[in-house]
Amino acid sequence: MSEKMVAIMKTKPAYGAELVEVDVPKPGPGEVLIKVIATSICGTDLHIYEWNEWAQSRIKPPQIMGHEVAGEVVEVGPGVEGIEVGDYVSVETHIVCGKCYACRRGQYHVCQNTKIFGVDTDGVFAEYAVVPAQNVWKNPKSIPPEYATLQEPLGNAVDTVLAGPISGKSVLITGAGPLGLLGIAVAKASGAYPVIVSEPSDFRRELAKKVGADYVINPFEEDVVKEVMDITDGNGVDVFLEFSGAPKALEQGLQAVTPAGRVSLLGLYPGKVSIDFNNLIIFKALTVYGITGRHLWETWYTVSRLLQSGKLNLDPIITHKYKGFDKYEEAFELMRAGKTGKVVFMLK
């Protein structure tokens, strides 16, 4: 193994990133070193690349970017048990304390002292990465690396879609970005019908169809609520899944969901949102879930089994694959332009 490696690094507090050569890290106690096979770009990585307000408040350059990964364990640090060299793995990004009130109740996904791998630590946009052993997930060999690297965001989609019953339910999904597309795949694999998708981008509406959406709506040109009511015989949808983070989409979805329906919110909003709680939530007796992270480790088992079942249609979602990191700038600019689904760097 070489002593040097290539990595995409946020080298300074400004727009962009650099491809640099750095030392291969050594795993310490409770850590493992993985050789990266595949790694994918998340919206969080794009925020860091763009150096937006959130990134400026959280990221401390210089730092290796990236957190979605599939790789092979090549070295095990002192004190690590149950993980061996050669294991094919992915990584849960929430590094939890195990001691706070939430953790002691088994609610690790809302740990009050969470650190994010690849945000608060060096990440996986590199040929090798050091990972906390407690965050390692072993993958079945049957799952290809370009799918295995998507398990972390896929877990977000699974928790959003499966927060309540979904089989045989009518569904509205607002936002067909990468997470929304994963949500479509999970909803279809889980027996939802019809799956209606509201998305302003022509490119992403076409992707939504390829993934399995039964109906697509352009909210800039069509009346979303009217279209949903027409499709559902005036009843509204049983389940509303909000992936966009657009306040207008939230309002439209709450109007379009049937009384006593279920709402799952994953999209993050730019600020405070004004909602008619009385008429859109309380008097409709809606059940509303806020979704963050993934349930550890229940969601990972669900994700892995869905992938192994062969029922998830993910190929249309992976719109771009790059061999290595050389074209990382092109990849990020395409994402900024909204012209991608998931972007995957393949290192093997």
Swiss-Prot record:
Cofactor or coenzyme needed: Zn(2+)
Binding residue positions for Zn(2+) 2: 97, 100, 103, 111
EC number: 1.1.1.103
GO MF entry, a single one: adenyl nucleotide binding
Pathway participation: Amino-acid degradation; L-threonine degradation via oxydo-reductase pathway; glycine from L-threonine: step 1/2
Pfam families associated with the record: ADH_N, ADH_zinc_N
GO cellular component: cytoplasm
Protein name: L-threonine 3-dehydrogenase
